[in-house]
Amino acid sequence: MDAIRKQASRLREQVARQQQAVFKQFGGGGYGSGLADEAELNQHQKLEKLYISTRAAKHYQRDIVRGVEGYIVTGSKQVEIGTKLSEDSRKYGSENTCTNGNVLTRAALNYGRARAQMEKERGNMLKALGTQVAEPLRAMVLGAPLEDARHLAQRYDRMRQEAEAQATEVARRQAKARESQGNPDILMKLESAEAKLHDLKSNMTILGKEAASALASVEDQQQKLTLERLLSMVESERAYHQRVLQILDQLEGEMVSERQRIEAPSTPSSADSMPPPPSYEEANGVFASQMHDTSTDSMGYFLGEVLFPYHGVTDVELSLSTGEYVVVRKVTGSGWAEGECKGKAGWFPYGYIERRERVLASKVSEVF
C-alpha cells in the first residue's frame, strides 16, 4: 500500500510540473518560452487593451447620444414655451389697446418678432444636434463593425481557454505515456492530443491577429468620429448663441429707443422755425464770445444719441437717424450744434439729441 501511495504522489507531482510548464507556454506565465510564446502574450495583452478601449469609447458615445437626446427633448419644450410667449406678445401688439400712445405696442411687437427668431434658431440647433451628432454616433454604437470585432475577440478568448485546457490534457498524457513504458495506444492518444494542441495554437494566432486588426480599425474610427461629432456640437451651439446675441442686441436697441420716447420730452419744434445754421467762420469768430454757457469749448467734445430723425436741407447740415450717435464738437446759442456722425460733419438742431455719458464701444465705433 505504501508503495502504491508513493507512486501516486510521484505521478501527481510530475503532472503538476508538466502543467506548470505548459501553462507558462500557453498562458503567458513567463517570457522564457521562446519568441513565439512572447508574441502570443503580447497579442493577448494588445487584444485586452483594444477591447477595453473600444468598450469605453462605445459607452462614451452612448452617453453623448443620451445627453443630446435629453437636451433635444428639453430644448423642444423651451421652443414651445418661447413660441407661445412670442405669439402672446404679437397678439398684444397687434390689438393696440393702449389709449396713451403706442410705445409698448411697438416694443411688444418687436419682442414677439425677436423671440420667434430666437426660437427658430434654437430649433435649427436642436435639429443639427440630432442629425449631425446623435444619429452618427448611435449608428456606430449599434453598427456591425464594432460587434464583429468584439465577437472575434471573444472567439479568440474562448479558443485561448480551450488551448489552455488542451495543454493540461497533453501534460497528463505525457505523464501517462512515461509510466506506460511505450504502450502504443497511449502513445497514439498522446500524439493526437499534441496535434490538436498545435492546431489550436495555430488557429489562435491567426484569429488573434484578425481580432486585433478589426478592433484597432474600430478604435481608430471611434476616436475620429467622436471627436468630429463633438466639434460639430460645439460649432452648432456657438453659431446659435452668436445669432441669438445679434438678435438680442438689435432688440435691446429697439426697446431702449422706445423707452426713450416715453422718457424724452415731446419732439422739439421744427428746425424751420430756427434761424439758419451759422457758417463755420461765424461759429469760430462771432459766436466765440457768445457761448459762455452753451459752447463745448470749455467742456470738450461729447457723445450724443439721436432721439429724433433730422434731414439736412443745406450742404452744411448733417442728416441724422434715430438711435445714431454723434460726436458733438460745438453748440451755439441759436440752438444749432456742430458734430460728426459716420464720417460726415455738419450742423443739426441740438434739441434733437441727448448727451450720453456711457456708450457701448460698438456704438462708438459706428460714429467714425
Curated annotation (Swiss-Prot):
Membrane-spanning segments: none
SH3 domain residues:
299-358
Query: Which locations, inside or outside the cell, does it occupy?
Result: Cytoplasm; Cytoplasmic vesicle, Clathrin-coated vesicle; Cell membrane; Late endosome
Q: Which GO-annotated molecular functions does the record name?
A: phosphatidylinositol-3,4,5-trisphosphate binding; phosphatidylinositol-3,4-bisphosphate binding; phosphatidylinositol-3-phosphate binding; phosphatidylinositol-4,5-bisphosphate binding; ubiquitin binding
Q: Which residues form the signal peptide?
A: none
As annotated in Swiss-Prot or TrEMBL, what is the tissue specificity of this protein? Highly expressed in seedlings. Detected in flowers, leaves and stems.
Recite the UniProt keywords alphabetically: Cell membrane, Coiled coil, Cytoplasm, Cytoplasmic vesicle, Endosome, Membrane, SH3 domain
Source domain of life: Eukaryota
Q: Report the gene knockout effect.
A: Delayed germination, but almost normal growth after germination in sh3p2 partial mutants. RNAi plants exhibit cytokinesis-defective phenotypes associated with the aggregation of vesicles at the leading edge of the cell plate and abnormal cytosolic localization of DRP1A in dividing cells.
Q: Does the keyword rRNA processing apply?
A: no
**Result of mutating R172E?**
Strongly impaired binding to PtdIns(3,4,5)P(3)-containing vesicles and lower capacity to mediate the tubulation of liposomes
| GO annotations of cellular component type | autophagosome membrane; cell plate; clathrin-coated vesicle; cytosol; endosome; late endosome; nucleus; plasma membrane
Residue ranges of the region described as Disordered: 258-281
Coiled coil residues, start to end: 1-21, 146-210
- Any GO BP: positive regulation of membrane tubulation
How this chain sits in the membrane, per its record, is: Peripheral membrane protein
Function (record text): Regulator for autophaosome formation and/or maturation. Binds phosphatidylinositol-phosphate; highest affinity for vesicles containing PtdIns(3,4,5)P(3), followed by those containing PtdIns(4,5)P(2) and PtdIns(3,4)P(2), with minimal binding to phosphatidylinositol monophosphates, including PtdIns(3)P. Together with DRP1A, converts the fused vesicles to tubular structures at the cell plate during cytokinesis.
- What free text does the record give on domains? The N-terminal BAR domain is required for the interaction with FREE1.
Print the miscellaneous field. Knockdown of SH3P2 is developmentally lethal and significantly suppresses autophagosome formation.
- Quaternary structure (record): Homodimer. Interacts with FREE1. Interacts (via SH3 domain) with ATG8E and ATG8F. Component of a phosphoinositide 3-kinase (PI3K) complex containing ATG6, SH3P2 and FREE1. Binds to SH3P3 and DRP1A. Forms a complex made of SH3P2 and DRP1A and triggers its accumulation at the cell plate.
PANTHER family in the record, alphabetically?
Answer: ENDOPHILIN-A (PTHR14167:SF81), SH3 DOMAIN-CONTAINING (PTHR14167)
Q: What is this protein called?
A: SH3 domain-containing protein 2
* Species whose genome carries this gene: Arabidopsis thaliana (Mouse-ear cress)
Q: What is the lineage of its organism?
A: Eukaryota, Viridiplantae, Streptophyta, Embryophyta, Tracheophyta
Its gene name is SH3P2
